[in-house]
Amino acid sequence: MASDLEQLCSHINEKIGNIKRTLSLRNCGQEPTLKTILNKIGDEIIVVNELLNKLELEIQYQEQTNSSLKELFESLEEDYKDVEHLKENIPPHLPQVTVTQNFVNGSDLDPEEPVKVEEPAPTKKPPKEQRSIKEMPFITSDEFNGIPAYMKSRLTYCHINDVIKEINKAVVSKYKILHQPKKSMSSVARNLYHRFIDEETKETKGHYFVVEADIKEFTTLKVDKRFHGILNILRHCRRLSEVRGKGLTRYVIT
């Protein structure tokens, strides 16, 4: 019984001590000098939080770069192995490489050995020049940091560049069809070709653009609120502009 009473007293005293400490801290917060210090600490916490956000974005960018470099290294390593394999396993039916000299001394020639005259290789026709397709440049880390916070929301640097990559995919797919000879088109490509032509206007002449139907046709992107939010960011960064007409919004690559 006595031990229970002691435990109860100890518990009550602990609660009283907690209340006293709380009241003491509350009073400290009302003092002008301490209040100024607390406000400074709060401002510094906000600055540190912004720095941490920038650091997180930089880490994501470095990870993406590191991953790309790793893939490039693996690809080059495979190419090098293939070249070494071909070098060590040259088929016997291929002609051997002969070393020719521009100047030969008359004393070095064997008068009984006929001189071999090498015929010039036939000139190959230069390949037909392919028409280049304009693509949207990726957002840089400095540009991302300059985007207003209300536009970015929870979007990251990688999210925006992933969408740019898909938009470029749609642009390239569309204009490959437009540059393709009509005789070699399939029925599906021909239908798309006619749609592309119908969607052109005077404002889009000479420019590369896509519409939402192209995004759905050539990519796996969802044309939703998040997608349109990223389009607003791309307009802010001057990566694209909009041309409206005939019930369509055309996203022109700038």
Curated annotation (Swiss-Prot):
Role played: Component of the SKA complex, a microtubule plus end-binding complex of the outer kinetochore that stabilizes spindle microtubule-kinetochore attachments, promotes alignment of chromosomes at the mitotic spindle equator (chromosome congression) and assists suppression of the spindle assembly checkpoint. Kinetochores, consisting of a centromere-associated inner segment and a microtubule-contacting outer segment, play a crucial role in chromosome segregation by mediating the physical connection between centromeric DNA and spindle microtubules.
Q: Which InterPro entries does the protein's record reference?
A: SKA1 (IPR009829), SKA1_MBD_sf (IPR042031)
The Phosphoserine modification is found at 241
Q: Which parts form a coiled-coil structure per UniProt? A: 49-90
Query: Motif Slightly degenerated SXLP motif, which positions?
Result: 92-95
Q: Where is this region: Disordered?
A: 105-131
Q: Where in the cell is it found?
A: Cytoplasm, Cytoskeleton, Spindle; Chromosome, Centromere, Kinetochore; Cytoplasm, Cytoskeleton, Microtubule organizing center, Centrosome
UniProt name for this protein: SKA complex subunit 1
Q: Which GO terms describe its biological process?
A: attachment of mitotic spindle microtubules to kinetochore; cell division; chromosome segregation; establishment of meiotic spindle orientation; mitotic cell cycle; mitotic metaphase chromosome alignment; mitotic sister chromatid segregation; negative regulation of mitotic spindle assembly checkpoint signaling
Report residue spans for region: Binds microtubules and protein phosphatase PP1 subunit PPP1CA: 131-254
Question: In which domain of life is the source organism classified?
Answer: Eukaryota
In this chain, the stretch annotated as Flexiple loop that anchors MAPRE1 covers: 91-131
Species per Swiss-Prot/TrEMBL record: Bos taurus (Bovine)
Compositional bias, Basic and acidic residues, is annotated for: 113-131
GO cellular component assignments: centriolar satellite; centrosome; ciliary basal body; cytoplasm; intercellular bridge; meiotic spindle; mitotic spindle; mitotic spindle microtubule
Which residues, renumbered to this chain, carry the PTM Phosphothreonine? 156
Q: State how it assembles.
A: Component of the SKA complex, composed of SKA1, SKA2 and SKA3. The SKA complex is a homodimer organized around a central W-shaped coiled-coil structure, formed by the interacting domains of SKA1, SKA2, and SKA3, each end of the 'W' is extended further by the C-terminal microtubule-binding domains of SKA1 and SKA3; the complex forms extended structures on microtubules. Interacts (via SXLP motif) with MAPRE1 (via C-terminus); the interaction is direct and stabilizes the kinetochore-microtubule attachment of the SKA1 complex.
